[in-house]
A protein has these predicted regions:
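Catalytic cores of nucleotide-sugar-dependent glycosyltransferases that transfer UDP/GDP/TDP-activated
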Residues: 1-223
Length: 225
């Protein structure tokens, strides 16, 4: 089984919280169990030079976002016997820090779309894309809206894992139209309470929804009973 693990942060490259720990350890554990697991993440400006030196340039391509096309460079590296894909756009990611910027919505909509565009450029097709938290929540949405008609994508299944439900990617509806470029029929997928909620979109469009632990799942599903 081939798994592409999509995360906004991962050790040993960069970390701000528990997601990086999971993204740095789970793929290696899955590989030991026989899965072919790879990781995709942004190429941040804060990644240490000694780690950058181990990266290899693969290719570059454009990522369509509504009316714009944005550059994306693709690099790869290996850590803990796992292949990492790092997506480069200096405008979005060459900054001090990972989160907390005024354009975080645009940055991670770009990242989500770039993951799928990357798969059109390389000789690799995962069976499963495991998305994590709101920063990759648009992957299953984009996959179903734009990419299912492409042969390479027809068999791909998605898992969406919630690590921190407090951060859901809530923004104005203009993010869905002017940034994500979703057609009118797809707007209800990400709409919640008259705003964009990217996590809601991922829950709606993913084949499987999971949480970071059974306890976390019980905590939030029990509130819905």
């Amino acid at each position: 089984m081939k798994i592409l693990y999509a995360a906004s942060e991962a050790l040993p490259f960069i970390a701000s919280g528990g997601l990086a720990d999971v993204a740095g350890s789970l793929p290696a554990a899955l590989k030991k169990e026989g899965a072919e697991c790879r990781v995709v993440m942004p190429l941040y400006g804060d990644i240490k030079p000694e780690l950058r030196e181990k990266m290899r340039y693969v290719t570059h391509f454009n990522v369509p976002l509504a009316w714009r096309n944005q550059y994306c460079g693709l690099f790869e590296a290996e850590a803990n016997n796992v292949k990492y894909y790092l997506l480069d756009n200096e405008y979005y990611f060459k900054r001090s820090g990972i989160y907390g910027f005024y354009d975080d919505a645009e940055r991670f909509v770009f990242f989500s779309k770039a993951i799928l565009e990357m798969l059109t450029k390389i000789d690799y097709a995962p069976d499963i894309i495991n998305c994590n938290d709101w920063q990759t929540a648009m992957v299953p949405v984009f996959l179903n809206v734009y990419y299912r008609s492409i042969e390479k994508f027809r068999g791909i299944r998605t898992v969406f894992t919630i690590h921190n439900i407090a951060y859901q990617g809530k923004y104005g509806m203009e993010i869905a139209t002017d940034i994500a470029g979703l057609p009118d029929y797809a707007l209800p997928i990400v709409e919640y309470d008259h705003n964009v909620n990217m996590m809601k979109g991922a829950i709606d469009q993913s084949d499987v929804v999971s949480t970071v632990s059974p306890t976390y799942c019980l905590l939030y599903t029990s509130r819905c009973v």
